[in-house]
UniProtKB/Swiss-Prot annotation:
InterPro entries: MEMO1_fam
Source domain of life: Archaea
Protein name, entry field: MEMO1 family protein PF1638
Gene3D superfamilies (UniProt xref): LigB-like
CDD domains the record matches: MEMO_like (cd07361)
Family: Belongs to the MEMO1 family.
Short name of one Pfam family: Memo
HAMAP family reported in the protein's UniProt record: MEMO1
PANTHER family referenced in this protein's UniProt entry, alphabetically: PROTEIN MEMO1
Length: 292
């Protein structure tokens, strides 16, 4: 089973420009490490011109720490298709950079242990939040010469219960099968503006990005504290429009079980830096979680 790229040429280039763009993002890339301290990362999933550099910071850190065998990638289900919690079962995902294999055994075991997920490919058919992560992984895997695999999971339900159930299942499955993994939570942060129907504050155009950042930082601080409950409390209190909190919650739960003790915000920006539009402003953050 091959899942074909559906947003190549839209969210990211579908030709040789993709490699050139990735090279530009990674001009400061260091040597591949072997520490393997990073347990999870947060990366945005907007068009590369808006959030590609921010996403690259997460993958740069992972590469310099050492690539894992498997990336378990969680993204929000924007389409509403398929199972509410859908683990892609088997086969390969294709992008302009080639194909990357799904770890079928790990996918199945996570699904079984979670008791809330289904093996389902329909939810992934048109979803972009996981696909846009793959060129970063493929580019670095090619540099490394490693045969990296993935387990894609879309979330149509995102709450504390899902975070704990899936985070625990991913940890137990990876331990049981002896897999070295990193969890990637694919999410954008605040979606502000009339375009999104979310205008909790108004200000001059030059002030808006800072206000968006302030509100995002209320959530990000909770993430950096590994505080799942606090993160959802902040989101609910502000009616915050972050689109992938469930995946971040899973990353926190998994990381704590895996022994992570620190989290770092590597980069933050908003779409305003590129678009200069206040009709729609989206926040983007790069975060990693690490063991001692």
């Amino acid at each position: 089973m091959i899942r074909r790229a559906v947003v190549a040429g839209q969210f990211y280039p579908d030709d040789a420009e993709l490699v050139e763009m990735l090279k530009r993002f990674f001009t400061d890339l260091g040597e591949e490490g072997n520490s393997r301290r990073i347990t999870a990362g947060v990366a945005p999933h907007a068009g590369y011109i808006f959030s590609g550099y921010t996403a690259s910071r997460t993958y740069k850190a992972i590469y310099e720490d050492g690539l894992p065998e498997v990336f378990v990638i969680l993204g929000p289900n924007h389409t509403g298709l398929g199972s509410p919690i859908a683990v892609y079962p088997k086969g390969e995902w294709e992008t302009p950079l080639g194909r990357i294999k799904v770890d079928e055994k790990l996918a199945r075991r996570i699904t079984e242990l979670s008791e809330i997920a289904d093996l389902d490919d329909l939810a992934h058919k048109y979803e972009h939040s996981i696909e846009v992560q793959l060129p970063f992984i493929q580019y670095l895997a090619e540099l490394s010469g490693k045969d990296v695999k993935i387990v894609p999971i879309t979330l149509g339900i995102q709450d504390e219960e899902v975070s704990y159930a899936l985070g625990k299942a991913i940890y137990e499955a990876s331990q049981e099968l002896g897999r070295d993994i990193v969890v990637i939570a694919s999410t954008d942060f605040m979606h502000y503006g009339e375009f999104y129907g979310y205008v909790p504050f108004r200000a001059r155009a030059d002030e808006l990005p800072n206000l968006v950042k302030e509100w995002d930082m209320r959530v990000i601080r909770r993430i950096l504290d590994f505080d799942v409950e606090g993160m959802f409390e902040e989101i609910n209190a502000m009616n915050h429009t972050m689109c992938g909190p469930g995946g971040v919650g899973v990353g926190i739960v998994y990381s704590k079980l895996a022994g992570a003790i620190e989290a770092e915000l590597l980069h933050y920006t908003t779409s305003f830096e590129v678009s200069r539009s206040t009709d729609a402003i989206v926040g983007y953050a790069s975060i990693v979680m690490r063991k001692a």
